[in-house]
Amino acid sequence: YKKEIFRDLDKKYNSHLYSGLLGILMKYCHRKLEIYKNKKDNYDKILEIGAGSAPHFNFMKCSYNEYHIAETSDYAEDFHKNNPKVKLLKYDGRNLPYQNETFDRIIISHCLEHILSPEEFIQEMMSKLKKGGVLSISLPTDPGIAWRLGRLFIRLFTIKKTYQISGEEFNYMNATEHVNSIFNLVSIIRFNYKNQYEEHF
């Protein structure tokens, strides 16, 4: 049943996520991830995980030599196949198929809430990061008042038009996809990594 609901939704999801008020908020999140970066910050290799159509690519302030994307969806693979600026590799959502200490920076935006074993996956990401490298994480405020109000608005006014699914199916999608709360994820990160900078927006 879940596969039936998600069939052919990837493209609609990406276009909807970056349009209207929701799009403004998502773009703001991407800008904030780059707030302390500039062209003087050069990274040889950057990896973005769960990039979808890679909207963060357009907000990059730092310079780099290679931009890699690790994705699980067929839509992303098809979307980037003719893009010479990125190197996309499809993976199983658990094991990153790269050698240890490969990347100078790893970006993961609004993805950890979807992963069943987030602590293990964070350790997997860290193993691919070079010593002294940067791991940039963006998390949604789910649960949270603003998040819940936004979700209610989408369910009541846009979900049928955008996805052609019911409000109940939309709630089911979110329940099965957002398996980690931000409170749990932040606690895991704070406990394991003391040398980190945290900003709320």
Regions found by a protein language model. Name each.
Residues 94-106:
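A short acidic, Gly/Pro-enriched loop at the edge of an enzyme's catalytic core
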Residues 4-24, 116-127, 134-201:
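S-adenosyl-L-methionine-dependent methyltransferase catalytic module, highlighting the catalytic core
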Residues 23-43:
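Conserved alpha-helix/loop element of class I SAM-dependent methyltransferases that forms part
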Residues 52-95:
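Class I SAM-dependent methyltransferase SAM/SAH-binding core
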